[in-house]
Amino acid sequence: MKLMQFQIDDIIKSALLEDINYVDVTTDYLIDEDDISTAKYVSKDEGILCGIEVALRVFQLLDDGVTCRIFINDGEAVKKGDIIAEFTGHTKALLKGERTALNLSQHMSGVATATNRCVKLVEGTKASIADTRKTLPGLRVLQKYAVTVGGGRNHRYNLSDCAMLKDTHLDAYGSMTNAVNVLRERMGHTVKIEVEVGNLEELQEALDLGVEVIMLDNMSCEDMTKAVEITAGRAKLEASGNVTAETIRKIAETGVDIISLGALTHSVKAFDISMKMS
């Protein structure tokens, strides 16, 4: 996944408006308009870097003359004490953009780091690590980019990407079989269908319907192993629910194709980065 400038500019502008409003009473009253400084991004954590270009864009939207020397790129490992980048430009722009740039890059690096840890935990199995739509409102494009930087895969970006019958849809509509048949009649032929199942009986119904992806929701590892055997490659199997660092390896070893985690985006720990002025 590649970030496009038009995708991130609106996010950054909204964040800057939220933080600066119409004046930075500290910076605007202390710093001369023509004052130039260099700001160093320094890591205080260990993991996978993500969001350095986003941080640069924050400063450039405040001062289009800001330049950057990047020493560590998105997707590369970073450790405590590493100098990640140096930004040079008007001091006012660097100070005003500091918190927004750090908030975004720290969060994105946290997502990438958490994803990478999960990827490493399932190495040697066929399972891929995927995100969900449990993203923070307004930040989905940045979070999903960070997941790919960490070595994970993107699930649906939005509701138009794939038809996904969850328990709430089936509770509201009724029969899984009827729902799948109606969807096939009404939607485009290129759209895939994923169905959420909670037991092996529902799995068999989904397989009989020929859906492309089946989500195994909160199933035991024993039942997931049986589900893999029953499916025998006829559909992609996605494990979801109660996935933790302690359980993810056992889940992967059942033979599922995908393990999806909402925790990669909805509650990730921010990566610690500081900015030093000179």
Residue ranges and their predicted role:
Residues 274-278:
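Active-site loop ensemble at the mouth of alpha/beta enzyme cores that anchors a bound cofactor
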Residues 2-209, 213, 225-230, 236-238, ...:
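Acidic/glycine-rich phosphate/pyrophosphate-binding loops and surrounding catalytic core
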Residues 218, 241, 263-264:
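Short secondary-structure boundary segments
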